[in-house]
Amino acid sequence: MNRNTMDIYKILKQLPHRYPFLLVDRVLAIDKGKSIRAVKNVTINEPFFQGHFPYRPVMPGVLMLEALAQAAALLAFDAIDTTPDEDSVYYFAGMDGVRFKRPVEPGDQLILEVELVRMKAGIFKFKARALVDNELAVEAELTCAVRKIA
């Protein structure tokens, strides 16, 4: 596999998330310290569709943002050449300019695009967006932080 991509096995080594909360299936491209393009395949089998909404399943917006944050984490860890361990955690620190533009439904492929704007002292600022069929689904500016917990 290309060094600039990640399959699910590499993703599992970088992110602590597991089913049902792992929301990145593959990294299509990563430009070290600059940007990442990843994918979340959305299926009817997602557990959140049972209640959101049974009559017309729609992916919750907060989970679209979480998928973007997970892609951002992969970009951040690659930028600083680290693999997270049990003594550190990657937190959301803020979201700005969040706009939802279209619903995401079963069968959609959510393309996650994240650009690293700046990083300093373990704080990362990103510009992020997710698309379905080249149509904007959500956009946001994300702030995340890596912190030691032990």
Swiss-Prot record:
Q: Which GO terms describe its cellular component?
A: cytoplasm; membrane
Q: Where are the transmembrane segments?
A: none
Q: Which GO terms describe its biological process?
A: fatty acid biosynthetic process; lipid A biosynthetic process
Q: Its Enzyme Commission number?
A: 4.2.1.59
Q: Which UniProt keywords apply?
A: Cytoplasm, Lipid A biosynthesis, Lipid biosynthesis, Lipid metabolism, Lyase
User: Which cysteines are disulphide-bonded?
Assistant: none
Which GO-annotated molecular functions does the record name? (3R)-hydroxyacyl-[acyl-carrier-protein] dehydratase activity
Of which family is this protein a member? Belongs to the thioester dehydratase family. FabZ subfamily.
What is this protein's record name? 3-hydroxyacyl-[acyl-carrier-protein] dehydratase FabZ
